Protein backbone atom coordinates (compact mmCIF):
# COMPACT_ATOMS: atom_id res chain seq x y z
CA UNK A 1 0.00 0.00 0.00
CA UNK A 2 1.31 3.42 -1.00
CA UNK A 3 0.08 6.80 0.25
CA UNK A 4 0.69 9.95 -1.78
CA UNK A 5 0.07 13.57 -0.81
CA UNK A 6 -1.38 15.81 -3.51
CA UNK A 7 -1.59 19.13 -1.70
CA UNK A 8 -3.55 20.44 1.28
CA UNK A 9 -5.91 17.64 2.38
CA UNK A 10 -5.83 15.47 -0.74
CA UNK A 11 -4.33 12.01 -0.29
CA UNK A 12 -4.19 9.10 -2.73
CA UNK A 13 -4.11 5.55 -1.36
CA UNK A 14 -2.86 2.93 -3.83
CA UNK A 15 -3.46 -0.71 -2.95
CA UNK A 16 -5.41 -3.33 -4.90
CA UNK A 17 -7.22 -0.29 -6.30
CA UNK A 18 -6.73 3.47 -5.97
CA UNK A 19 -8.74 5.71 -3.66
CA UNK A 20 -8.60 9.51 -3.61
CA UNK A 21 -9.53 11.29 -0.39
CA UNK A 22 -10.55 14.97 -0.38
CA UNK A 23 -9.59 16.29 -3.84
CA UNK A 24 -10.14 19.97 -3.09
CA UNK A 25 -9.52 23.22 -4.92
CA UNK A 26 -6.15 23.77 -3.22
CA UNK A 27 -4.89 20.35 -4.31
CA UNK A 28 -3.43 18.92 -7.50
CA UNK A 29 -6.81 17.48 -8.41
CA UNK A 30 -6.02 16.37 -11.96
CA UNK A 31 -3.01 14.32 -10.85
CA UNK A 32 -4.94 12.87 -7.92
CA UNK A 33 -7.93 11.78 -10.00
CA UNK A 34 -5.80 10.32 -12.78
CA UNK A 35 -6.03 6.50 -12.63
CA UNK A 36 -8.27 6.67 -9.54
CA UNK A 37 -11.01 4.12 -9.00
CA UNK A 38 -13.08 5.91 -6.35
CA UNK A 39 -13.30 9.15 -4.39
CA UNK A 40 -13.90 9.60 -0.66
CA UNK A 41 -14.91 13.05 0.60
CA UNK A 42 -14.93 13.96 4.29
CA UNK A 43 -17.10 17.09 3.97
CA UNK A 44 -18.35 19.68 1.52
CA UNK A 45 -15.89 22.55 2.03
CA UNK A 46 -14.20 23.48 -1.28
CA UNK A 47 -10.69 22.87 0.04
CA UNK A 48 -11.79 19.23 0.37
CA UNK A 49 -14.08 18.94 -2.64
CA UNK A 50 -13.46 20.49 -6.07
CA UNK A 51 -16.95 19.89 -7.41
CA UNK A 52 -16.51 20.34 -11.16
CA UNK A 53 -13.43 18.09 -11.63
CA UNK A 54 -14.94 15.37 -9.46
CA UNK A 55 -18.21 15.44 -11.39
CA UNK A 56 -16.33 15.47 -14.71
CA UNK A 57 -14.29 12.43 -13.66
CA UNK A 58 -17.39 10.24 -13.53
CA UNK A 59 -15.86 8.35 -10.61
CA UNK A 60 -17.99 6.86 -7.85
CA UNK A 61 -17.98 9.09 -4.78
CA UNK A 62 -18.65 8.36 -1.12
CA UNK A 63 -19.41 11.18 1.31
CA UNK A 64 -21.86 12.58 3.85
CA UNK A 65 -25.27 13.84 2.73
CA UNK A 66 -24.23 17.45 1.96
CA UNK A 67 -21.47 16.16 -0.35
CA UNK A 68 -23.88 13.90 -2.21
CA UNK A 69 -26.41 16.71 -2.59
CA UNK A 70 -23.77 19.16 -3.82
CA UNK A 71 -22.45 16.78 -6.46
CA UNK A 72 -25.93 15.78 -7.60
CA UNK A 73 -26.88 19.44 -8.01
CA UNK A 74 -23.77 19.89 -10.18
CA UNK A 75 -24.83 17.08 -12.50
CA UNK A 76 -23.24 13.94 -11.06
CA UNK A 77 -25.18 10.76 -11.76
CA UNK A 78 -27.03 9.67 -8.63
CA UNK A 79 -26.00 6.05 -9.12
CA UNK A 80 -22.36 7.14 -8.73
CA UNK A 81 -23.01 8.84 -5.39
CA UNK A 82 -23.01 6.97 -2.08
CA UNK A 83 -24.08 8.63 1.17
CA UNK A 84 -22.21 7.62 4.32
CA UNK A 85 -22.28 8.35 8.02
CA UNK A 86 -20.18 7.40 11.01
CA UNK A 87 -20.29 3.69 11.78
CA UNK A 88 -20.68 2.58 8.17
CA UNK A 89 -18.41 -0.07 6.67
CA UNK A 90 -17.95 0.44 2.93
CA UNK A 91 -15.96 -1.28 0.17
CA UNK A 92 -15.16 1.26 -2.56
CA UNK A 93 -13.44 -0.59 -5.41
CA UNK A 94 -13.01 -3.61 -3.17
CA UNK A 95 -11.09 -1.89 -0.34
CA UNK A 96 -12.62 -2.05 3.13
CA UNK A 97 -13.09 1.40 4.69
CA UNK A 98 -14.53 2.30 8.08
CA UNK A 99 -16.46 5.58 8.24
CA UNK A 100 -15.84 7.47 11.49
CA UNK A 101 -17.24 10.52 13.23
CA UNK A 102 -20.05 12.92 12.50
CA UNK A 103 -19.14 16.61 12.82
CA UNK A 104 -16.51 19.10 11.71
CA UNK A 105 -14.52 20.52 14.61
CA UNK A 106 -16.00 23.67 16.12
CA UNK A 107 -14.76 26.91 14.55
CA UNK A 108 -16.81 29.17 16.83
CA UNK A 109 -19.98 28.82 18.88
CA UNK A 110 -21.66 31.31 16.54
CA UNK A 111 -20.50 29.55 13.36
CA UNK A 112 -22.54 26.78 11.70
CA UNK A 113 -21.53 23.15 12.21
CA UNK A 114 -20.87 20.93 9.22
CA UNK A 115 -21.09 17.19 8.74
CA UNK A 116 -17.64 15.57 8.61
CA UNK A 117 -16.58 11.94 8.50
CA UNK A 118 -13.16 10.36 8.65
CA UNK A 119 -12.06 7.30 6.70
CA UNK A 120 -9.97 4.41 8.00
CA UNK A 121 -8.72 2.56 4.92
CA UNK A 122 -8.06 -1.16 5.37
CA UNK A 123 -7.54 -0.48 9.11
CA UNK A 124 -4.17 0.99 8.12
CA UNK A 125 -4.51 4.57 6.87
CA UNK A 126 -6.61 7.20 8.65
CA UNK A 127 -7.83 10.46 7.11
CA UNK A 128 -9.92 12.43 9.63
CA UNK A 129 -11.01 15.36 7.48
CA UNK A 130 -11.48 18.38 9.73
CA UNK A 131 -12.13 16.55 12.99
CA UNK A 132 -10.37 14.58 15.69
CA UNK A 133 -12.21 11.35 14.95
CA UNK A 134 -12.06 8.44 17.37
CA UNK A 135 -10.90 5.06 16.09
CA UNK A 136 -12.19 1.65 17.17
CA UNK A 137 -10.40 0.05 20.11
CA UNK A 138 -7.56 -2.24 19.21
CA UNK A 139 -6.98 -0.98 15.67
CA UNK A 140 -3.23 -0.39 15.12
CA UNK A 141 -3.27 2.52 12.67
CA UNK A 142 -0.11 2.54 10.55
CA UNK A 143 -0.42 6.03 9.10
CA UNK A 144 -2.55 8.98 10.18
CA UNK A 145 -3.07 12.12 8.12
CA UNK A 146 -2.63 14.92 10.65
CA UNK A 147 -4.09 18.41 10.08
CA UNK A 148 -1.56 21.12 10.88
CA UNK A 149 -3.42 24.40 10.21
CA UNK A 150 -6.94 25.77 10.18
CA UNK A 151 -9.34 28.13 11.98
CA UNK A 152 -10.56 25.22 14.12
CA UNK A 153 -7.15 23.83 15.09
CA UNK A 154 -4.84 24.14 18.09
CA UNK A 155 -1.58 22.24 18.14
CA UNK A 156 -2.30 21.05 21.70
CA UNK A 157 -5.46 19.33 20.43
CA UNK A 158 -3.55 17.80 17.53
CA UNK A 159 -0.96 16.36 19.91
CA UNK A 160 -3.66 14.90 22.18
CA UNK A 161 -5.41 13.34 19.18
CA UNK A 162 -2.23 11.77 17.78
CA UNK A 163 -1.51 10.34 21.24
CA UNK A 164 -4.97 8.76 21.28
CA UNK A 165 -4.69 7.29 17.77
CA UNK A 166 -1.10 6.10 18.31
CA UNK A 167 -0.17 5.69 14.64
CA UNK A 168 3.19 4.32 13.59
CA UNK A 169 3.72 7.39 11.41
CA UNK A 170 1.97 10.58 10.35
CA UNK A 171 1.85 12.78 7.28
CA UNK A 172 0.79 16.45 7.38
CA UNK A 173 -2.44 17.54 5.72
CA UNK A 174 -4.60 20.68 5.80
CA UNK A 175 -1.42 22.70 5.43
CA UNK A 176 -2.31 25.29 2.76
CA UNK A 177 -3.27 27.88 5.38
CA UNK A 178 0.20 27.94 6.94
CA UNK A 179 3.64 28.96 5.76
CA UNK A 180 6.27 26.27 5.37
CA UNK A 181 7.83 27.48 8.62
CA UNK A 182 4.47 27.18 10.35
CA UNK A 183 3.96 23.64 9.06
CA UNK A 184 7.43 22.63 10.18
CA UNK A 185 6.85 24.11 13.63
CA UNK A 186 3.63 22.13 14.02
CA UNK A 187 5.31 18.92 12.89
CA UNK A 188 8.21 19.50 15.27
CA UNK A 189 5.81 19.62 18.22
CA UNK A 190 3.99 16.49 17.04
CA UNK A 191 7.29 14.68 16.60
CA UNK A 192 8.60 15.81 19.97
CA UNK A 193 5.50 15.11 22.05
CA UNK A 194 3.96 12.05 20.37
CA UNK A 195 6.85 9.62 19.83
CA UNK A 196 5.85 9.14 16.20
CA UNK A 197 7.63 9.19 12.86
CA UNK A 198 6.72 12.24 10.78
CA UNK A 199 6.85 11.63 7.02
CA UNK A 200 7.74 14.85 5.24
CA UNK A 201 8.13 13.42 1.74
CA UNK A 202 5.35 13.37 -0.83
CA UNK A 203 4.67 9.65 -0.55
CA UNK A 204 5.24 6.67 1.71
CA UNK A 205 5.23 2.95 0.96
CA UNK A 206 3.63 0.92 3.75
CA UNK A 207 4.24 -2.40 2.05
CA UNK A 208 1.69 -5.16 1.69
CA UNK A 209 -1.24 -5.14 -0.70
Predicted regions and their residues:
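Core dinuclear metal-dependent hydrolase active-site scaffold
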Residues: 1-34, 83-140, 152-154, 202-209
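Binuclear metal-ion centers of metallo-dependent hydrolases, dominated by the metallo-beta-lactamase
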Residues: 1-4, 75-93, 138, 159, ...
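Short glycine/proline-enriched coil/turn segments at helix->beta-strand junctions
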Residues: 15-17, 34-36, 56-60, 76-78, ...
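Redox-cofactor binding/interface segments in oxidoreductases and associated redox assembly factors
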Residues: 21-22, 40-41, 98-102, 146, ...
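Active-site metal-binding motif and surrounding structural segment of the metallo-beta-lactamase
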Residues: 25-70, 141-145, 166
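Catalytic metal-binding/acid-base residues of hydrolase active sites
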Residues: 45, 67, 103, 132, ...
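Conserved alpha/beta-hydrolase "acid-adjacent" motif
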Residues: 48-50, 154, 180
